[in-house]
């Protein structure tokens, strides 16, 4: 159902995303959020993963600014309506890093690849520290994973197609999250069939 003030924030991401794509992310408001009905209210810990790789501004299309607005809107919603809940933010690019909410509006896209695995791994680590009865990851991205941190610490990159190694390691990280009871809700800003198929596996 549509979200109303006071409802627990159990986002139905696919339905919310349909509204966002129809209106444009830059015009997304709380009225466009769709939630799943919950039988009880429990404390929720959320990590928002924001893709700041170069593809977010490729071909003259700025997808990063609207993506930041979505992240900031979620932060405002959680902090004002659910003071008992916790939310933290992670930027992922060649690697991944936590960023304070106050610095989020200033973040810019860089000449980076997309290390989705590193983002998911850091999100899992943060959620373990945050506690809470329920946990979730909200992933905002526009493209395929194209980077991977190897055991040696070296960053392996491949921007061409879906690299089998990068894909396998990213999906492995998503599987670990699910085993820990952490759903991954993805705002996918691209429409290519192979990328949509990848997201369905997360």
What is the predicted role of each segment?
Residues 111-113, 143-201:
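VWA/integrin I-like adhesion module and closely mimicked acidic/polar interface patches used
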Residues 17, 39-101, 104-140, 145-147, ...:
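Von Willebrand factor
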């Amino acid at each position: 159902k549509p979200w109303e003030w006071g409802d627990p924030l159990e986002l139905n991401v696919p339905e919310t995303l349909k509204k966002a794509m129809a209106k444009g992310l830059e015009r997304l408001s709380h009225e466009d959020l769709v939630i799943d009905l919950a039988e009880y209210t429990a404390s929720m810990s959320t990590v928002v993963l924001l893709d700041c790789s170069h593809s977010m501004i490729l071909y003259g299309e700025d997808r990063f600014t609207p993506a930041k607005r979505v992240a900031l809107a979620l932060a405002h919603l959680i902090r004002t309506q659910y003071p008992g809940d916790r939310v933290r933010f992670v930027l992922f690019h060649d690697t991944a890093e936590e960023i304070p909410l106050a610095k989020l509006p200033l973040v810019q896209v860089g000449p980076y690849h997309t290390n989705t695995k590193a983002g998911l791994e850091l999100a899992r680590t943060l959620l373990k520290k945050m506690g809470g009865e329920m946990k979730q990851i909200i992933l905002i991205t526009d493209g395929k994973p194209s980077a991977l941190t190897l055991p040696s610490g070296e960053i392996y990159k491949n921007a061409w197609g879906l690299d089998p190694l990068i894909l396998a390691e990213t999906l492995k990280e998503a599987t670990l999250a699910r085993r820990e009871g952490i759903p991954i809700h993805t705002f996918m800003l691209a429409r290519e069939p192979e990328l949509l198929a990848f997201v369905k596996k997360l």
